[in-house]
Amino acid sequence: MLVRKLTLIGAALARAALALQQEDFVVNGELLPGVREIDRAEVPEMHAGLMPLEEDEDGRALFFWRMGEQCGKRCSNELIVWLNGGPGCSSMDGALMETGAFRVAEDGKLYLNSGSWHTRGTMLFVDQPVGTGFSRPGRDGRLRTELSQLADDFLLFMERYYAVFPEDRRRTLVLAGESYAGQYLPYFADAVVRRNAERAPEERYKLQNVMIGNGWVDPDLQSLSYVPFVSSRGLFGPETRNFQDILRDQEACQNAINHGPAKGFSHPECEGILPKLLSSIPGPDRPVQQCINMYDIRLRDVFPSCGMNWPADLPNVHKFFGTPGVLEALHVDPQVAGPWVECKSAVSEALVNAHSRPSVHLIPGLIEAGVKFVFFNGDQDVICNNMGVEMLIAELRWRGHMGFSNATENFDWYHSDADAKTLVAAGVVKRDGPVTFISVFNASHMVPFDVPRISRGIIDIERSATILGVKGDSRMLITVDTEEDVTLSTNAERNQQIRHNQLKRLNGDTRKFTIAVFGLTISSIIGVIVYFSMRLHYGAKIRAILTNPKSGTSSADDFSMDDEYTGTVMGDFHHGTHKKGQYYAVPDTDISSSELHSV
């Protein structure tokens, strides 16, 4: 009944969408800072704006940014919907720091992303739930409280979106995202499957895959992974502060799970483990108290932020959206939207899920309905770590068995550039029919942020666009950049270098200006001192000639300059071989192509 009701609403919205045309959402790239310095051939066709979910023009609406595919030989006619998590965090994180066509430099200008996923399909970044990013909740200001409501909104959005972009309806639909999107994506996939069941074949959405990166899928089981994960990194033991308390919390969580499903969304006994761990594992002694970064265990942050000041590019994104004219170019009214906020706590606090189950319960049914799942995980993440994701997969039932079966294929994943002369260890892959797990080496909670070009290989693995090889007793799965990828990477690195040089010159000019001003100030002070010294010496004669000595006045101006830096302390971690547009090198893992044997 609910799906039929939504269908009727969607049909009404589709009719209303006739009033909206693609031209209403066209983004003139040259209005975005930095794009004029990029080769036009490298700039994708873009559309953006607010897609209404109601016929009321001031009603609920979701903001989207569409980047058309530029994929050459690897085009597979896919629409990849990307969602960030939170809940309440903007998918512009994904658009400008992860899988989109651009990254943002320190001055707020765009440069090419060498690992953009739009070289594999059309990317659609959506701010949701309502109230997130530039999306609006409507006249009444109501925010969503249940995942099922979010799924309803997503269906309405897609109905309206496809009416405006009918060519995308013919594409295969891939739902992708990270973190709390591990809740969104299965719910949205389930809504699509139920919708399709009531539609004629030609009217069905072509949902094929769900790709969850460092996903929050099973809150209870994943909470049990924190202690063993940090222990495996040598950060937790008997000497740890609150050691016994944390072990008691771990035991209480396990016992609660053993006694059956939670009455709410998750067991309260499991929710306190990570916060207590973060407060108990300090960083090296510093003037300020530090803790591990919950999104990248290699990093440190100021307590109690513990990762909330991360990633490093975040201030650049704020600067981009704060540049005059940017919001107008994206068809957003700055007077209505206000400044961009990455994550809105009000949205997170509203989504209590009093009547929703964790998405893990939907996955077996989706697999039976023919939906494939790819779980990819950066191996340096704490909050949604590898152990927790593998634990939840082990509890999933599909094709009559629990977890990965004896038929599971295991691969060492290597990534190669186009000439295939050297390979870089990228991760490990487990594949069992419709379920794939990928552990990505040297990557954080945001895999594409750390290893952009390697992250693009995840899509190739999902499509089986890979090479198989053997090295010793190990089976190898190899992803290879296309010629178009190499061209994009070369142009991206050149574009990035231009931005770097411009910033360097700008900073140099600023420094010279500062030195000149400082020098002029010092000269002025010296001049004033000399002047008053001479005045003290010759003052009587001057006053006698020019003024009445009894009416003279004096003044003194205090001069001070405070150049103290008060930025966030992030610890001593150095990325080493990491560089935007390149790889993290894994020591002693380069392999010559001569060592490969095809199978």
UniProtKB/Swiss-Prot annotation:
<dbReference type="GO" id="GO:0006915">
    <property type="term" value="P:apoptotic process"/>
</dbReference>
<keyword id="KW-1133">Transmembrane helix</keyword>
<dbReference type="GO" id="GO:0006508">
    <property type="term" value="P:proteolysis"/>
</dbReference>
<feature type="glycosylation site" description="N-linked (GlcNAc...) asparagine">
    <location>
        <position position="406"/>
    </location>
</feature>
<dbReference type="InterPro" id="IPR029058">
    <property type="entry name" value="AB_hydrolase_fold"/>
</dbReference>
<feature type="signal peptide">
    <location>
        <begin position="1"/>
        <end position="19"/>
    </location>
</feature>
<feature type="active site">
    <location>
        <position position="445"/>
    </location>
</feature>
<dbReference type="GO" id="GO:0016020">
    <property type="term" value="C:membrane"/>
</dbReference>
<dbReference type="GO" id="GO:0004185">
    <property type="term" value="F:serine-type carboxypeptidase activity"/>
</dbReference>
<feature type="topological domain" description="Cytoplasmic">
    <location>
        <begin position="534"/>
        <end position="599"/>
    </location>
</feature>
<keyword id="KW-0121">Carboxypeptidase</keyword>
<keyword id="KW-0325">Glycoprotein</keyword>
<dbReference type="Pfam" id="PF00450">
    <property type="entry name" value="Peptidase_S10"/>
</dbReference>
<keyword id="KW-0053">Apoptosis</keyword>
<feature type="active site">
    <location>
        <position position="381"/>
    </location>
</feature>
<feature type="glycosylation site" description="N-linked (GlcNAc...) asparagine">
    <location>
        <position position="442"/>
    </location>
</feature>
<keyword id="KW-0732">Signal</keyword>
<feature type="transmembrane region" description="Helical">
    <location>
        <begin position="513"/>
        <end position="533"/>
    </location>
</feature>
<feature type="topological domain" description="Lumenal">
    <location>
        <begin position="20"/>
        <end position="512"/>
    </location>
</feature>
<keyword id="KW-0812">Transmembrane</keyword>
<feature type="active site">
    <location>
        <position position="179"/>
    </location>
</feature>
<comment type="function">
    <text>Protease with a carboxypeptidase B-like function involved in the C-terminal processing of the lysine and arginine residues from protein precursors. Promotes cell fusion and is involved in the programmed cell death.</text>
</comment>
<dbReference type="InterPro" id="IPR033124">
    <property type="entry name" value="Ser_caboxypep_his_AS"/>
</dbReference>
<dbReference type="InterPro" id="IPR018202">
    <property type="entry name" value="Ser_caboxypep_ser_AS"/>
</dbReference>
<comment type="similarity">
    <text>Belongs to the peptidase S10 family.</text>
</comment>
<keyword id="KW-0645">Protease</keyword>
<keyword id="KW-0333">Golgi apparatus</keyword>
<dbReference type="GO" id="GO:0005802">
    <property type="term" value="C:trans-Golgi network"/>
</dbReference>
<keyword id="KW-0378">Hydrolase</keyword>
<protein>
    <recommendedName>
        <fullName>Pheromone-processing carboxypeptidase KEX1</fullName>
        <ecNumber>3.4.16.6</ecNumber>
    </recommendedName>
</protein>
<dbReference type="InterPro" id="IPR001563">
    <property type="entry name" value="Peptidase_S10"/>
</dbReference>
<keyword id="KW-0472">Membrane</keyword>
